[in-house]
Regions:
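Phosphate- and other anionic-substrate recognition elements at nucleic-acid/protein interfaces
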Residues: 1-146
Length: 146
């Protein structure tokens, strides 16, 4: 089975985990729907039995309207591509997938850096970045909770 983790923000990333090979492939979130689809296609071609966990996101009242709109558009593009490839998808809140990793810092930059370090410890063979760490950890959360 292939498990895809997606952090749909513009600075997010994609993690593709092959359970049979115990290998993780990471991508920074692509800029175009064509590039997004290419990543999903690669996973689906490798194994028809593919599942996705995507971070369920929403805009905050403090977000600028244009950035909130872009954020929502990116999320919608991912859902559309996953639907077109007929990939079952679970939307998970950040609170849910981060819960087993608590306690985490309240300050966003500190929390992001700690999440990155956790992912590096779990996947030392991969080049984990701030862009890809959340996606990788969502895959771990799914595997541990399926």
């Amino acid at each position: 089975m292939i498990i895809i983790g997606i952090d749909p923000g513009a600075k997010g990333g994609v993690a593709i985990y092959d359970e049979a090979e115990h290998k993780m492939i990471l991508h920074k979130c692509p800029e175009t729907p064509k590039e997004m689809a290419a990543i999903i296609n690669t996973a689906k071609v490798k194994d028809e039995n593919t599942f996705c966990v995507i971070e369920k996101v929403h805009a905050f009242p403090t977000d600028a309207r244009s950035s909130a709109f872009k954020f929502g558009c990116n999320f919608g593009k991912w859902l559309g591509i996953l639907g077109a490839y007929d990939i079952p998808t679970l939307e998970v809140t950040p609170q849910s997938w981060m819960k087993p990793l608590q306690p985490l810092p309240k300050v966003k930059t500190e929390r992001k850096n700690q999440l990155k370090q956790i992912a590096i410890n779990l996947f030392p063979e991969n080049k984990i970045t701030l862009s890809t760490s959340d996606a990788a950890l969502m895959v771990v959360w799914y595997v541990n909770n399926e």
